[in-house]
Amino acid sequence: MRKKMRLLVLFICLTTKYALSSPVMTRQDLFKQAHRDVLCANLINFNDFYYSMEEPKNITGIPADMTVHWKTGKVFYTLISDEMKMSLQVLHPSGETETIKVAGLGQSTTVDNLNDIVYLATDNGIYKYKDDGSIELYTALGEDVMYITVSNDGNTMYIATWPQNRVHKITNDGQKQDTFPPIPNGHGLTIDTRNNIFFSATKTSYVLKADQSVPIKIKGLPSERMTGVFVSRSDEIFAMDENSNLYSIDAENASAKHLGNFNVSGVNTFALDSADNVLIGVKNGILKFLAYEKNPCSDYEK
């Protein structure tokens, strides 16, 4: 009997010691561990970053022509419904989406991040979108504007109009509009900080270098599968194809270098936010890949 009592006391002492030395796993701890397991199992490493995908933002339709207001973190995009109707949308940092109500048909957006101005391209001209959600007509009244981009200093705007996709140059605070012969037609206009203009024509990507009059085909990009060009906050120029292959573009040499892949198919648009996180638009969703400069799983043990 005494022996059994001694064994029971020893068992209780050992159990108490183990319990004190091993912290209790709470539900929150288990959730964090599960989240870390998923993050580290799906981590992607290229372009000097480690990328992990957040929970997708579900939408109904196909996002297009995505752009980001770096100051507020708002993501602007064109939503194409299953009935092929277009509307302009804003995805707020809170995760809520909002339809931008504008006269006529909203077709695309661009952000002048230097001056914190958001421009809306519609079938009845170009509007400015204000922080309070209100809009005002800016220029090109009566023009069916499909695409729009703004120079780095905000003084020059380029627009592509329907149905010819004719490109116009707008200056003098929206008061002067001229045709722009170097680009007879173009989709997805984008301009970098050195005023090089990127665009697509007949499913091929081109760059028109600043102060030149003849566009050059960008070498190293696949034909017919590109989703667009985006200039990051750090002035790097990127392109992505429909299979989420990311490319770095050298405007001076009109060439592209393949960087890596996000393992996503059916890409229709992409963008980068102010922290170089990558946003990818696919049918019924916007995916966000967080960018880490250091490996967040360097001390991870399965």
What is each residue range found by the language model?
Residues 55-86, 106-107:
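Beta-strand-rich domains and repeat architectures in extracellular enzymes and scaffolds
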Residues 54-61, 99-104, 138-143, 178-184, ...:
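Surface loop/turn motifs at the tips and blade-to-blade linkers of beta-strand repeat domains
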Residues 24-62:
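A short helix->beta-strand "capping" segment at the edge of beta-propeller domains
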Residues 74-77, 117-120, 156-159, 196-199, ...:
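Conserved beta-propeller blade signature
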Residues 91-95, 129-134, 170-175, 209-213, ...:
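Short loop/turn segments that connect beta-strands within beta-propeller blades
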Residues 80-81, 123, 162, 202-203, ...:
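Short loop/turn segments immediately following the C-termini of beta-strands
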Residues 61-67, 104-113, 143-151, 184-192, ...:
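Repeated scaffold domains used in trafficking and secretory/extracellular systems
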Residues 264-302:
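Blade-level signature of beta-propeller repeat domains, shared across WD40, Kelch, NHL, RCC1
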